[in-house]
From Swiss-Prot:
GO cellular component, one term: host cytoskeleton
GO molecular function: structural molecule activity
Protein name from the UniProt record: Microtubule-associated protein VP5
Family: Belongs to the reoviridae microtubule-associated protein family.
Organism of origin: Aquareovirus G (isolate American grass carp/USA/PB01-155/-)
Cell compartment(s), UniProt: Virion; Host cytoplasm, Host cytoskeleton
Keywords: Capsid protein, Host cytoplasm, Host cytoskeleton, Outer capsid protein, Virion
Matching Pfam families: Reovirus_Mu2
InterPro entries in alphabetical order: Reovirus_Mu2 (IPR012494)
Keyword Cell membrane: no
Domain of life: Viruses
Function: Minor inner capsid component. Displays NTPase and RNA 5'-triphosphatase (RTPase) activities. May function as a cofactor of polymerase. Associates with microtubules and plays a role in the formation, structural organization and morphology of viral inclusions, where the assembly of cores and the replication of viral RNA occur.
Keyword Iron appears in the UniProt entry: no
């Protein structure tokens, strides 16, 4: 077994116990990876290492654990206090493996002030004041190490006696970190390669994975990285990631060769790599992401001055986005269009991310994409991509198949995102525009529009009210009277309730039942007030949306009205915490970026429902022949090389409640709701889709409304789609 030490990189998801995600996403995609890889990073080990890193220097900690090897087979057994220890052995004589005389036990158990002399019979136990290095040194030679201190290092800690004998000794919080006396370690099965967070390089065939990325600052052992890497270089125990990938993923990779890594190459037997493994089915549940470190350069004041760059890190950007857009690391690009706004590829990187921070810090920043700053950034250079990892996109944030609502303030590039991102897939029907509902669509459908009514309402207010309200909303005058702004917010809420809430309620079926729908809104109140049964996600983006509103003066009512509208919508919103809108964008478009980057050839596979012809005829419809009519509930796609026989023979547990109106609109409701996580992992789901008849529909004349319940199954329809190579 080859052991590879991994010090997690920045933003490593500790909730995911699979360390493969922090190395390279391809390790997760090879067949039977769980049979080839083992991960040794138990919770007790991380907790002990974190506590030891506080009291020991990096060099002391490395020295303390140098003789501990993976897997750890020893355990620490925590003894009770002297009086309770004696009482335990009296109550359970079979536990007296030290043959302590009964007279000694009785004296200790009945004494008001017992001494610790009874522990002299426990030969080799760890004393209460023992150093952590001392506790670690006991691990390698003994199966069970008895200890009188809970501060140990190198093996899991369990109770030596039942929990009742520790009353008054350990608090409930301390007990939560100690295993019960009946606990036994899980059997560790050795595999071809074992990944671990135990930073010990003394065992044979143990190497340090040399990932070029910042360490996770929340992991205390990150401070050990320079020292640990220096030791690995001296002992020739560095493991380059490309060497690991060549051995396990693709023998065609050309790793760099140097004397420092000769032992790792020999250990992996790179001269005789295995044949490349290809999975029998693509997994659409996971999307690889990385953190992009960029340098933003402002306009120079003169020709001789070279202004300093601002370094930022864009977190959790889909790795395939840069591949599809043909963006090169290390190359400098213009940041803005002639209009002054950011170039589309940079906007998409920001909108699909989780956060933007100043590189080297945890300070989040919001970028001003409009050309509004005193010295705006004009050039961008991607320095490197770090912290590659895999995120699951089927489990959330959208949970069910039918519809989801994303709330974003004005100026959040909702229309830009929906127009620009699907254009990357000209050959693929990724988005059905009829299944996207814009945040302003409802207000614009009124006559006069909602924004026009709001402008009329502002005109009825006393002179100066709007100006004073804007100063307060923009916080340019902290001491200003907020009465004017409160008046506008109250009037806005009354206006909204009088005309928008009922209109929103009337279009509930269109929002929630026409297929897989993406609904945009300004606030979650818009859905909650109208009782719309839809999952609502309060989104946030790493962009200053207020500056974008100011940079768009041609909207209804001008900048002033738009700023007040934005403020009123934000005051309507609930106090629920926001989440990155990029998480939803990655869920919808991330698997398609992966397919585009790999130049996959796709073929349609549809989720279908059947409507009996006799039911349609009973409602006055004229139908050709007696075969059931097929509804394409959702047209998905799969790779032509995937084997999906199990998909075509499965029936979903949910049933479709189908309503067909006289004007041909098809509404589908799932009972129970259909979770995305239960759908086949090899299927590419469209970002949005509207249910349609499967051609040919065979409907000659329409009739009255029809409602029917149908099962859901999968069928292959249509012809394969060839995918153009990636690039702008």
């Amino acid at each position: 077994m080859i052991t590879i030490v991994v010090i997690p990189t920045e933003r490593f998801p500790w909730t995911d116990t699979n360390l493969l995600n922090s190395i390279d996403y391809r390790l997760n995609n090879i067949p039977k990876s769980n049979q080839r890889f083992a991960v040794y990073a138990p919770a007790w080990l991380r907790l002990q290492l974190e506590e030891a890193a506080v009291s020991l220097t990096p060099s002391q900690l490395l020295a303390a654990i140098q003789d501990i090897h993976v897997p750890v087979t020893s355990t620490f057994a925590l003894l009770p206090k002297a009086k309770r220890f004696a009482q335990w052995l009296l109550d359970d004589p079979s536990s007296n493996i030290w043959h302590i005389p009964v007279t000694v036990l009785n004296v200790t158990a009945t004494s008001k002030h017992p001494t610790s002399d009874i522990f002299n019979y426990v030969v080799g136990h760890v004393s209460p004041n023992a150093e952590l290095a001392t506790t670690a040194s006991r691990v390698s030679g003994t199966q069970v190490v008895y200890t009188r201190t809970s501060k140990v290092l190198g093996a899991p800690l369990r109770l030596a006696a039942p929990t009742s004998y520790y009353s008054g000794y350990l608090s409930s919080q301390q007990l939560s970190h100690v295993y019960p006396s009946s606990w036994t370690p899980e059997t560790f099965k050795k595999k071809e390669i074992c990944f671990t967070i135990l930073p010990s390089l003394t065992s044979p065939k143990t190497f340090l994975l040399d990932v070029d990325a910042p360490r996770d600052p929340s992991f205390p052992l990150s401070v050990m990285w320079p020292l640990l890497r220096n030791d690995a270089v001296k002992s020739h125990r560095l493991m380059p990631p490309n060497a690991l990938l060549r051995r396990t993923v693709d023998p065609a990779l050309k790793p760099e060769w140097s004397a420092d890594v000769d032992p790792s190459f020999r250990a992996l037997r790179l001269s005789r790599p295995r044949g490349a493994n290809t999975s029998s089915c693509h997994n659409r549940h996971h999307v690889p992401v990385c953190d992009i470190q960029c340098a933003l350069t402002p306009e120079p004041l003169n020709d001789s001055e070279k202004p300093p760059a601002t370094h930022i890190t864009i977190h959790a950007v889909p790795s395939d986005l840069l591949t599809v857009l043909d963006i090169t690391v290390g190359k400098e690009y213009p940041l803005r269009l002639e209009s002054g706004m950011y170039v589309p590829w940079m906007l998409m990187s920001l909108l699909m991310s989780d956060d933007v921070t100043l590189t080297g810090t945890r300070r989040s920043v919001k970028l001003e994409t409009a050309h509004a700053a005193q010295r705006p950034f004009t050039q961008v250079k991607i320095l490197r991509c770090v912290s590659a990892r895999v995120t699951s996109v089927r489990a959330g944030p959208a949970t069910y198949l039918n519809a989801v609502c994303l709330t974003l303030p004005k100026g959040s590039f909702k229309s830009t995102m929906i127009d620009t991102l699907p254009s990357l897939f000209p050959e693929w029907p990724v988005v059905s525009t009829t299944a996207i509902v814009d945040s302003d669509h409802l207000g614009d459908s009124l006559d006069p529009t909602f924004e026009q009514r709001f402008a009329t309402m502002l005109e009825t207010l006393p002179p100066g009210t709007v100006d004073q309200a804007i100063r307060v909303a923009l916080a340019t005058c902290p001491t200003a009277d907020e009465t004017a702004l409160q008046l506008i917010v109250t009037s806005f809420n009354e206006l909204y309730a009088s005309c928008m809430t009922e209109a929103q309620r009337n279009r509930v079926p269109i929002l929630t039942q026409q297929g897989r729908t993406l609904v945009f809104a300004h606030s979650d109140y818009e859905m909650l007030a109208a009782n719309v049964p839809i999952q609502v996600i309060r989104g946030a983006i790493p962009i200053d949306h207020t500056v974008n509103i100011i940079a768009r003066p041609n909207r209804v009512g001008g900048t002033a009205l738009q700023l007040l509208l934005d403020y009123c919508y934000r005051m309507q919103a609930s106090p629920i915490a926001t989440m990155p809108a990029g998480a939803l964008y990655r869920q919808l478009f991330g698997p398609w970026l992966r397919a585009k980057a790999d130049c996959e050839q796709l073929t349609p596979v549809s989720l279908i429902a059947e409507v009996p012809a006799r039911v349609m005829r009973a409602a006055g419809w004229t139908i050709q022949d007696d075969m059931p009519l097929i509804i394409n509930v959702m047209r998905c796609y799969r790779n032509v090389d995937d084997q999906i026989d199990d998909v075509l023979t499965r029936t979903e547990t949910s049933r479709a409640i189908i309503t067909i109106s006289a004007d041909g609109i098809i509404l589908v409701e799932y009972a129970p709701p259909l979770p995305l996580i239960t759908l086949p992992s090899s299927i590419l789901l469209p970002a949005t889709y509207t249910a349609t008849w499967l051609e040919p529909p065979r409907i000659l004349l329409t009739g009255s409304n029809v409602s029917v319940t149908s099962g859901l199954s999968w069928a292959e329809v249509g012809s394969p789609l060839d995918v153009p190579p990636p690039g702008v």
